[in-house]
């Protein structure tokens, strides 16, 4: 089996709000139809799908309805990412210390899906080196 693309798909009752939020967070754009929106990142890669779920009930992290899935967005400037997320309609759920060398904050997107903004995690080259040196 060859996987040619993997995409996270969120349910949402308000397709335009949810897809616009994620397109703005990723610096990308949205392709729309009546029941499914495709979110592309700034480089034009298909990253997120948003499907119409008129009766969608958002997760209530951490205690209520289960979160099902969440995204981690790793950034170099956590304060700027926080400001952008909140300006776009994210709701902070759990604070983190943006002055710490490594950490994360938890938010809910407009449809209530939790996501994290993290910083100080290994860069892609470090991850590739680790995987190259630790394969069986």
Predicted regions and their residues:
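Polar/charged alpha-helical tracts
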Residues: 80-83, 87, 129-133
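A short, acidic/glycine-rich surface segment
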Residues: 55-60, 125-126
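Short beta->alpha transition motifs characteristic of CBS
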Residues: 52, 117-124
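A short, polar/charged loop-to-alpha-helix boundary motif
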Residues: 121-136
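Active-site-proximal flexible loops/turns
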Residues: 18, 84, 116
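Core segments of cupin and vicinal oxygen chelate
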Residues: 2-3, 9-53, 87, 93-95, ...
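Short, compact, well-ordered microdomains
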Residues: 91-119
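Vicinal oxygen chelate
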Residues: 5-13, 39-42, 46, 59-84, ...
